[in-house]
UniProtKB/Swiss-Prot annotation:
UniProt keyword annotations, A-Z: Chaperone, Fimbrium biogenesis, Periplasm, Signal
UniProt xrefs under NCBIfam families: PRK15208.1 (NF011755)
Subcellular location: Periplasm
Pfam family membership, one: PapD_C
GO biological-process terms attached to the record: cell wall organization; chaperone-mediated protein folding
PANTHER family cross-referenced by the UniProt entry: CHAPERONE PROTEIN FIMC-RELATED, PILUS ASSEMBLY CHAPERONE
Family: Belongs to the periplasmic pilus chaperone family.
Gene name tied to this protein: lpfB
UniProt-recorded name of the protein: Probable fimbrial chaperone LpfB
Induction / repression: Induced during the exponential growth phase.
Native source species: Escherichia coli O157:H7
Amino acid sequence: MDRMMKSKFVALALSLFLSQSVLAGGVGLSSTRVIYDGSKKEASLTVQNKSKTEEFLIQSWVDDAAGSKKTPFIITPPLFKLDPEKNNILRIVNITPGLPQDRESVYWVNVKAIPSKSDDSENKNVLQIAVRTRIKLFYRPAGLKGDVKTAPNELRFTRNGNQLRVDNPTVFNITFNQFFANDKEIEKAGMVPAKGALNITLPAGVGSVSKIKYNTINDFGSXAEMITKNVD
């Protein structure tokens, strides 16, 4: 095995080891986003403690993009202890009428895992860190017209100076996964709101942009197929 192949093998093995350690050592969620079907009374999300030894105090809430907790949603239970290798289901309930019925609305689910103090940490200088996970909550009204699978194809792009305007005529919020202008990747392009627009700042030196290539994140948190669109 030559040196380059050996280095790649070691790097791969190390990355697999680290990823398995992370998965085995803490709290995880059953999905990377929650789709709340407006025809249902609630949506759910499973919290998983993958540690064999540690227990955690789990605190959960819903807020908006600005961080305000004044939202139409509550989570039950908002606070509970999660034992090692156990799961618990969070129930997200819409308690306030009045959300738009002609498009999706977006909020955020926050789950904070606080390690319990162990006997071994008594009288020791042990640093315990609470970890918060924040994922999108999409409220999808009942009877919403349109196809979420084809919505990314309907985006329209217009350039104005160093800004690329993305118009979304659909009723669905569309989150970019990868985004390329002249084959140059623009990281964290963001989300285009339903029936709204997003302005993306193009990096210096990108040149004249006539085509955009991108893919988006679907309801399951996976990357959809790449799409190529012209820029007006």
